[in-house]
Amino acid sequence: MVRLWWLLIFVMLTTKGWAAEFQLSSPTIKSQGKIGHEHVFAGFGCSGGNVSPALQWQGAPKDTKSFALTMYDPDAPTGSGWWHWVIFNLPPTLNSLPANAGKLDGGIAPAGSIQSVTDFGQPGYGGPCPPAGDKPHRYIFTLYALKLDQVPLRSDASGAMVGFYLRQNMIAKASFTAFYGR
């Protein structure tokens, strides 16, 4: 009987280690690395390619009904940060986004997904473009696994409004941070 209890305790302690951890990554932007010129905004004094990075994820909770992704700069000199990309209603079967999925007229983002307004004043991806001379800013990419099939918002919703819905309906999230300065 004592052996059975020890076996049960061992299984309970080690099972979590076998479960896949929810992770988000990019083949072109390393966690804690520098964001390349191809992903930098084209405007506001920046001359990058404004191509959203390819992203991939694994280990999402089994009860995920949809995903949402945000890119946020907490260091922007606004007092409230800067939303660079907000895309939601991504299907639960998805495990990656190709490069340039943030381009609105490219037809690359998954059907049914919605890209809402960024702090650049338009929907779709808007790459890094911190003020010249600032220390490198942090850009946080976060993928949310949601308990909703659809976030009930449109493309004119602000990043803050979408963020509220995401946090209220989140099952899990995975993030990585990268840097850019000029």
Model-predicted segments: where are they?
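Bacterial N-terminal signal peptides
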Residues: 5-16
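N-terminus-centered regions that define maturation/targeting leaders and the start
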Residues: 17-182
